[in-house]
Curated annotation (Swiss-Prot):
Function field: Non-catalytic component of the 20S core proteasome complex involved in the proteolytic degradation of most intracellular proteins. This complex plays numerous essential roles within the cell by associating with different regulatory particles. Associated with two 19S regulatory particles, forms the 26S proteasome and thus participates in the ATP-dependent degradation of ubiquitinated proteins.
Biological process, per Gene Ontology: proteolysis involved in protein catabolic process
N-acetylmethionine sites (modified residues): 1
Protein family (similarity comment): Belongs to the peptidase T1B family.
Subunit details: The 26S proteasome consists of a 20S proteasome core and two 19S regulatory subunits. The 20S proteasome core is a barrel-shaped complex made of 28 subunits that are arranged in four stacked rings. The two outer rings are each formed by seven alpha subunits, and the two inner rings are formed by seven beta subunits. The proteolytic activity is exerted by three beta-subunits PSMB5, PSMB6 and PSMB7. Interacts with SERPINB2. Interacts with RFPL4A.
GO annotations of cellular component type: cytoplasm; cytosol; nucleus; proteasome core complex; proteasome core complex, beta-subunit complex
Record protein name field: Proteasome subunit beta type-1
PROSITE patterns: PROTEASOME_BETA_1, PROTEASOME_BETA_2
Residue positions assigned to the propeptide: 1-28
Family matches, as CDD domains: proteasome_beta_type_1
Domain of life: Eukaryota
Species: Bos taurus (Bovine)
Length: 241
């Protein structure tokens, strides 16, 4: 009996002296995933697109770094926002960047935003049995120069939207976007096209509000603005507690 117990003992531990809530050997489980928090958001306008994220990288009640933006530039017209497990975010973006270089060398041109979205869908679906723990949002300009946003689930299903939020504070941001950008559940309201200035004010306001309520969102806001002139970035401070 003691030999069977010793077989499941850890280094320097005697499980015979430790209480057990159930009968059976001690099982040690390894989880390949971790949730590192963070929030991403994208809004598409008539001739622009905005992709924004906070910069906090945390796990549980620990903050690993306060300077980890979740927006990655893919081309001069496309930006991707990734939230979830940071290790999978880095791996996935490196794979996408390698595919984009191969495409540019083969075709002598950059891949379009819609083609990048379709490619990302196949990459995610190929890992459906051991998926990347990443929620992706792509923002950019389409072939006609109009703003486009594509949202994904972890196994590759995607759709084109005008606005989308993902990550730890998405449940707070999405209803605000539905109301202020999509004019949902509103009556007798004129649907005015969204301007870049109003979209920027809205992005800043919703992230400031989210940082007040979500412990995984904060420190700073990184905004990537995609227009026909290229991509420019802005940084806005958020609360750091």
């Amino acid at each position: 009996m003691l030999s069977s117990v010793a077989a499941y003992s850890g280094a320097g531990r005697d499980l015979a002296m430790e209480p057990h809530s159930s009968v059976g050997p001690l099982q040690l489980r390894f989880s390949p995933y971790a949730f590192n928090g963070g929030t991403v958001l994208a809004i598409a306008g008539e001739d622009f697109s905005i992709v924004a994220s906070d910069t906090r990288l945390s796990e549980g009640f620990s903050i690993h770094t306060r300077d980890s933006p979740k927006c990655y530039k893919l081309t001069d017209k496309t930006v991707i926002g990734c939230s979830g497990f940071h290790g999978d975010c880095l791996t996935l973006t490196k794979i996408i960047e390698a595919r984009l270089k191969m495409y540019k060398h083969s075709n002598n041109k950059a891949m379009t935003t819609g083609a990048i979205a379709a490619m990302l869908s196949t990459i995610l679906y190929s890992r459906r049995f051991f998926p990347y723990y990443v929620y992706n949002i792509i923002g950019g300009l389409d072939e006609e120069g109009k703003g486009a946003v594509y949202s994904f689930d972890p196994v590759g299903s995607y759709q084109r939207d005008s606005f989308k939020a993902g990550g730890s504070a998405s449940a707070m941001l999405q209803p605000l976007l539905d109301n202020q950008v999509g004019f949902k559940n509103m009556q007798n309201v004129e649907h005015v096209p969204l301007s870049l200035d109003r979209a920027m004010r809205l992005v800043k306001d919703v992230f400031i509000s989210a940082a007040e309520r979500d412990v995984y969102t904060g420190d700073a806001l990184k905004v990537c603005i995609v227009t026909k002139e290229g991509i420019r970035g802005e940084t806005v401070p958020l609360r750091k507690d």
